Amino acid sequence: MDKKHILCFLVLLPLNMALISAESEEGVNQTDLGVTRNKIMTAQYECYQKIMQDPIQQAEGLYCNRTWDGWLCWNDVAAGTESMQYCPDYFQDFDPSEKVTKICDQDGHWFRHPDSNRTWTNYTLCNNSTHEKVKTALNLFYLTIIGHGLSIASLIISLIIFFYFKSLSCQRITLHKNLFFSFICNSIVTIIHLTAVANNQALVATNPVSCKVSQFIHLYLMGCNYFWMLCEGVYLHTLIVVAVFAEKQHLMWYYFLGWGFPLLPACIHAIARSLYYNDNCWISSDTHLLYIIHGPICAALLVNLFFLLNIVRVLITKLKVTHQVESNLYMKAVRATLILVPLLGIEFVLFPWRPEGKVAEEVYDYVMHILMHFQGLLVATIFCFFNGEVQAILRRNWNQYKIQFGNGFSHSDALRSASYTVSTISDMQGYSHDCPTEHLNGKSIQDIENVALKSENMYDLVM
């Protein structure tokens, strides 16, 4: 293509792109084909500008001239060499991490395919493993939806239990309720965001305000999850380490930390994104502005890690004071740690880096998706379904139901069931000490002894 044709193209292409933009502003829906065409035309325009502006090759010897092959722009290349660059992102089945190659023959001409006798660029690697990657991506997508769906169902059941049984009401249960509610909201918004926004390429390309608001809410609620986790850690640390005999804690500060503080990084990110990287519905991760969101979350995780280690240290010390068998003491400390690990989000500390290799990357993706998107189910299981007092209350109400409607149980069977329930409640003192006695102020020696043993019994929830 000579300079005259290039100049003509440079004049006509902006007019064509302006017409496409005008159609978008008038409300004409852009299809995937229209988005792809716009990307290719933009790349072609930039390529021809580069061809015109770059200085002429002054090196001696034969070389292939700079050119546009229809999808990518190629610089001058010395004869007998192979040029290489990454695959374009025009098509959904193209992998931008793969490479495109173009060969310059020994005579200084671009390689021609023997079948068509036309210049040819090797794009075969761009979609070589597309089928497998699409299959993996779909599996991860369905895994994400299933994880959030199970999380929503389990968290709603947990909230019904906590609200229905008034005997479970206490400050820590209140924190649990807020934590559960933040996970429910985040799961709902995540499902909507993935199905309605992230999968709609035309919507993402038009970059409307509605999808930016959706991304803002998604990032805010994600922050709420981690900061309500931090609230749980702060509460436990205050209760067990800082002030065992403290009066009732003020929950207002926990509400501010859990619901209020995440608004700050979310708003700062929204302002910065609108000013410096206002594209693709703010979904693109190719920007350092995401550190505005991830920085406070990482800080919350590190603080919670400190709380975890300090709580375990105090628990081991207190368990030694009780003069129990050493193996039993450390077993309870390990179990307490296992309860706190998912609460504090240690999975991001254990898996901070993405490994190299096809199999390793796939395993990493599955593990991270399970850890991230099944968190709600995990939290509901640990703090509700494995809660000893919740199990005792449900068992007691079930036994009362069977006695009331007389499902063939004798009077002695009913008495034995009631006796077993009472003994179970006496044994399961995890939340019994956590709720009614958490506000003691050293009124009696027996009360003080009970509170001293509270940290040991608090984690007898999974026995």
Curated annotation (Swiss-Prot):
Q: Where is this region: Required for RAMP3 interaction?
A: 287-288
Cystine bridges: C47-C73, C64-C104, C87-C126
Q: In which tissues is it expressed?
A: Expressed predominantly in the lung, thymus, heart and brain.
Q: Name one Pfam family in it.
A: HRM
Protein source organism = Mus musculus (Mouse)
Glycan attachment positions: N29, N65, N117, N122, N127, N128
Cytoplasmic-side positions: 164-174, 238-251, 314-328, 387-463
SUPFAM superfamilies noted in UniProt: Family A G protein-coupled receptor-like, Hormone receptor domain
- What residues correspond to the site Required for RAMP3 interaction? Q249
Question: Topology with regard to the membrane?
Answer: Multi-pass membrane protein
The transmembrane residues are 139-163, 175-197, 209-237, 252-272, 289-313, 329-350, 366-386
Q: What is the similarity comment for this entry? A: Belongs to the G-protein coupled receptor 2 family.
Cellular-component GO terms for this entry: adrenomedullin receptor complex; CGRP receptor complex; endoplasmic reticulum; endosome; lysosome
Q: Where is this site: Required for ADM interaction?
A: Q201, M372
Fetch the InterPro entries from UniProt: GPCR_2, GPCR_2-like_7TM, GPCR_2_calcitonin_rcpt_fam, GPCR_2_CGRP1_rcpt, GPCR_2_extracell_dom_sf, GPCR_2_extracellular_dom, GPCR_2_secretin-like, GPCR_2_secretin-like_CS
Function as written in the Swiss-Prot or TrEMBL entry: G protein-coupled receptor which specificity is determined by its interaction with receptor-activity-modifying proteins (RAMPs). Together with RAMP1, form the receptor complex for calcitonin-gene-related peptides CALCA/CGRP1 and CALCB/CGRP2. Together with RAMP2 or RAMP3, function as receptor complexes for adrenomedullin (ADM and ADM2). Ligand binding causes a conformation change that triggers signaling via guanine nucleotide-binding proteins (G proteins) and modulates the activity of downstream effectors. Activates cAMP-dependent pathway.
Q: Where is this site: Required for ADM2 interaction?
A: S285, H294, W353
**Extracellular compartment spans:** 23-138, 198-208, 273-288, 351-365
The processes (GO biological process) annotated in the record are:
adenylate cyclase-activating G protein-coupled receptor signaling pathway; adrenomedullin receptor signaling pathway; angiogenesis; calcitonin gene-related peptide receptor signaling pathway; calcium ion transport; cell population proliferation; cell surface receptor signaling pathway; cellular response to sucrose stimulus
Descriptive protein name: Calcitonin gene-related peptide type 1 receptor
Q: One GO molecular function term?
A: calcitonin receptor activity
Task: State the signal peptide span.
Answer: 1-22
The site annotation (Required for RAMP2 interaction) covers T287
Phosphoserine modification sites are: S419, S444
Listed CDD domains: 7tmB1_calcitonin_R
